[in-house]
Each structure stands twice: as C-alpha cells, then as structure tokens.
Amino acid sequence: MADKEALPKLREDFKMQNKSVFILGASGETGKVLLKEILGQNLFSKVTLIGRRKLTFEEEAYKNVNQEVVDFEKLDVYASAFQGHDVGFCCLGTTRSKAGAEGFVRVDRDYVLKSAELAKAGGCKHFNLLSSRGADKSSSFLYLQVKGEVEAKVEELKFDRLSVFRPGVLLCDRQESRPGEWLARKFFGSLPDSWASGYAVPVVTVVRAMLNNLVSPSSGQMELLENKAILHLGKDRDVPKL
C-alpha cells in the first residue's frame, strides 16, 4: 500500500491511463457510495453499471454513466456486458432473511462467481471483491462459508490483480432491514474508533480504501484487506467531492 502523502499523485497518474470500470451492485449501500466516489475522483474514462434494472439519477455528474441491464440467471447471454473493462468492482449481495438460504447462496456465490468468470474472459485485469470479516469456506455459518467459498473460487480465476475486502459491520443508514445489524451499527457507532476498529467500519471508509488501494502499486496478485487495514487505508480525507 502506498503512503498516504503519495495518493494525490497516484490518483493523477491513474487518471492518465484512461481506464474503464464496471460496478456490480451499484444499487446497494456500498455500491451507491462507490459510484459517487468514483465519479467525484474522476478516476476512469468510462464507468459502467451492470445490474438487473436500470437506475435513475438526477445529478448531472451521472449523465455519462453507462448501464447494462442483465438477467443474472442467464449471464452467459450477456457476456458482452463484461467485455472491455480494465477494472471491476463487485458489491453484489443479499441476505438469507430476504432471499432464503438458497437465494442467498445463488446471489452471493453463484452470481458473483459467474460475473467474475465473464469479467476475466472479457479482459478485466483488476477485480475488486467486497467480502466480509470472518469469511471462511470451512465455517459452520452459512454466510461466512459462502463468502469464503466465493473468495477461493475467484482467486482460482487468476486475475492479474485481485483485491478482496473483508469489512466488519458496515456503518450506514441501510434502507433494507437486516436483523441484528441495526443494533450492531448503533452499538459500534457509539464506540471510540480504537474499540470498534476490529468489528465495524463506515461504508464511505470501505469505498475510499478500495479506491486508494486501486491507485496504489500492487503488493501481489491477491490482496486481502481485513477491517483494520480498511480503516487505515480509507481514512484519507484528501479526496475530491462530487
């Protein structure tokens, strides 16, 4: 990871490369903030959203955002949507309470993995995966097991660069109700950073960590950033505002 003092120059150097990016899950809490930050920092020459429905934006800054509407149950038919992107961000995810156990696995593992496969085939060099603290394919908890499984499967695809982010409880005003998460946000949000750093993180911090890591030199083919590393890397406040 680069020293924070070097980030402004790294951002400018990255912009000069005129890269393109796609975002999966731009309608979710993390995806929405990610899109806003990407546009605010003006990092890419082309920004594409891939999702099951077209999103509506009123702000002028979003006017050049491309959108590809796909059926995640038939992703092979939409392979062209994944072609020609240098960088990909995957923020796809649902909950067991909303989709049921099978639906959760379908979205968080199958959709994510198939999207990664198509992105790799389409020329994506750097894939960024939003996972979860505690992800472990051997876990007895379905959520952590699925997150661990998809991490391992995506790593097998051998992207030139794979960055996996494992945040703790995401601190945000989530529109979708997730049992237990609201209480966790209230609890961790009231604690000093030094206490909460291993367990919780603001969504905007996760997003800024993703983008600061993006413009920084790679530390290897596969990078795994746990919650504390995300907090450290994402606290840079010297970023452009949209």
Curated annotation (Swiss-Prot):
Gene Ontology biological process: alpha-amino acid biosynthetic process; angiogenesis; apoptotic process; cell differentiation; positive regulation of programmed cell death; positive regulation of transcription by RNA polymerase II
Single GO molecular function: NAD binding
Modified residues (N-acetylalanine): A2
Subcellular location(s) per record: Cytoplasm
Keywords: Acetylation, Cytoplasm, Disulfide bond, NADP, Translation regulation, Tumor suppressor
Active site: Y143, K147
Changes seen on gene knockout: Mice are haploinsufficient for tumor suppression. 50% develop tumors within their second year. 30% of the tumors are hepatocellular carcinomas. Mice develop more cardiac hypertrophy and cardiac dilation following transverse aortic constriction (TAC) surgery.
Listed InterPro entries: NAD(P)-bd_dom, NAD(P)-bd_dom_sf, Semialdehyde_DH_NAD-bd
GO cellular component: cytoplasm; nuclear envelope
Positions contributing to NADPH binding: S27, G28, E29, T30, R52, R53, L92, G93, Y143, K147, L170, R178
Record region (Required for interaction with elongation factor EEF1A1): 2-25
A Pfam cross-reference name: NAD_binding_10
Protein's job: Represses translation by preventing reactivation of elongation factor eEF1A. May also inhibit nuclear import by competing with nuclear import substrates for binding to a subset of nuclear transport receptors. Has additionally been proposed to act as a redox sensor involved in cellular oxidative stress surveillance.
Assembly description: Monomer. Forms homodimers during oxidative stress. Interacts (via N-terminus) with elongation factor EEF1A1 (via middle-region); the interaction is direct and competes with EEF1A1 binding to guanyl-nucleotide exchange factor EEF1B2, thereby inhibiting GDP for GTP exchange and reactivation of EEF1A1. Interacts with nuclear transport receptors XPO4, IPO5/RANBP5, IPO7, IPO9 and KPNB1 as well as GCN1L1/GCN1 and LRPPRC probably through their HEAT repeats. Binds NCOA5/CIA.
Name listed for the protein in its UniProt record: Protein HTATIP2
Organism: Mus musculus (Mouse)
Species lineage: Eukaryota, Metazoa, Chordata, Craniata, Vertebrata
